[in-house]
Design a protein with these regions (language model features):
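OB-fold and OB-like single-stranded nucleic-acid-recognition modules
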Residues: 18-161
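Sec-dependent bacterial lipoprotein signal peptides
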Residues: 1-18
Length: 161
């Protein structure tokens, strides 16, 4: 009896360990959105933000990502919701990140600190972007859409059994 309880508890712990955030995205971060960071000066705040790539700009020694922010799920992955945005932000990290891999609309999560603000134009609108000095750039795998087609069994009777 004790062995059975111990086995069940061990299995629960092992399965619980599988359902966690990727290690680079773990930690304590300020619960603010990019829009809130612009409204009040949040320079120096540690954040974990994510969303979809709008543009990737490789520079001489760093790469900057212009992002549209979305909420993150419990794993730190951005939700894919067209109207659920928290504003826009720019995240920069030392090194080269290939724009062919980091294409527009790919999902990325960042951790880092807000190190300032930058004004850019979106069309004719002057937009103030929070600027994040990223410690982690986490590119998520592409979500695959799977169409599940259910068919009746090979006999004519339908039922709950």
């Amino acid at each position: 009896m004790k062995f059975r309880l111990l086995a069940i508890a061990g299995l629960a712990i092992l399965l619980g360990a599988c359902a966690s955030q990727p290690r680079p995205l773990q930690g304590e971060f300020a619960a603010i959105t990019p829009r809130e960071a612009v409204d009040r000066d949040s320079t120096g705040a540690a954040v974990r933000w994510g969303g979809r790539i709008i543009r990737v700009e490789p520079h001489e020694n760093r790469t900057c990502f212009e992002m549209i922010s979305t909420r993150l799920d419990v794993y730190g992955r951005p939700y894919w919701a067209s109207d659920d945005t928290g504003g826009r932000f720019i995240a920069c990290r030392l090194g080269f990140y290939d724009p062919a891999l980091f294409q527009p609309n790919r999902e990325v999560s960042f951790t880092g600190r807000i190190d300032g603000y930058e004004n850019r134009r979106i069309g004719q609108y002057d937009y103030r972007f929070p600027h994040v000095a990223a410690d982690v750039v986490y590119l998520w795998p592409v979500r695959e859409r799977v169409n599940v087609i259910t068919r009746p069994p090979p006999w004519p009777w339908w039922g709950w059994w």
